[in-house]
Regions:
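Hydrophobic helix-and-loop "lid/oligomerization" segment in the mid-to-C-terminal part
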Residues: 1-86, 91-121
């Protein structure tokens, strides 16, 4: 439950409410002794943000300190796989994911750029 509270506190909404994102760091997992299973449905937090079309969940796992995992959920007409595949990820049109080498700041910067390009069409 504490991981979800931390995710809610990280909620960031941008691009005129079209995009909502949350994040959990390695420290978040360690401090609350959270597991990957504890974070399974955290992607639903940004999906609940009113009016958003794209939900992003950035998280670092304790066993993979130099990577950031990203879960992507979209509503039509946006395609989640169009973003994830740019980073070697997979999935389908409404739900996809990828792993980006580097810090969370690097991953956010790269993913946000890809999402902005998707929104521009």
């Amino acid at each position: 439950m504490e991981l979800k509270r931390r995710a809610w506190r990280s909620l960031h909404i941008w691009k005129n409410r079209k995009v909502a994102e949350v994040s959990l760091t390695i420290d978040d997992f360690r401090e609350v002794r959270g597991t990957k299973a504890d974070a399974e449905d955290v992607i639903n937090i940004p999906r609940l943000a009113a009016g958003n079309q794209i939900a992003l969940f950035f998280h670092q796992l304790p066993d993979r300190t130099r990577e950031t995992r990203v879960s992507i959920r979209t509503r039509a007409p946006y395609d989640a796989i169009a973003v994830a595949s740019r980073f070697g990820g997979g999935g389908h049109a409404r739900a996809a994911g990828c792993t980006i080498k580097g810090s969370m700041a690097v991953a956010k910067r790269q993913l946000r750029r890809a999402v902005k390009e998707l929104l521009l069409g």
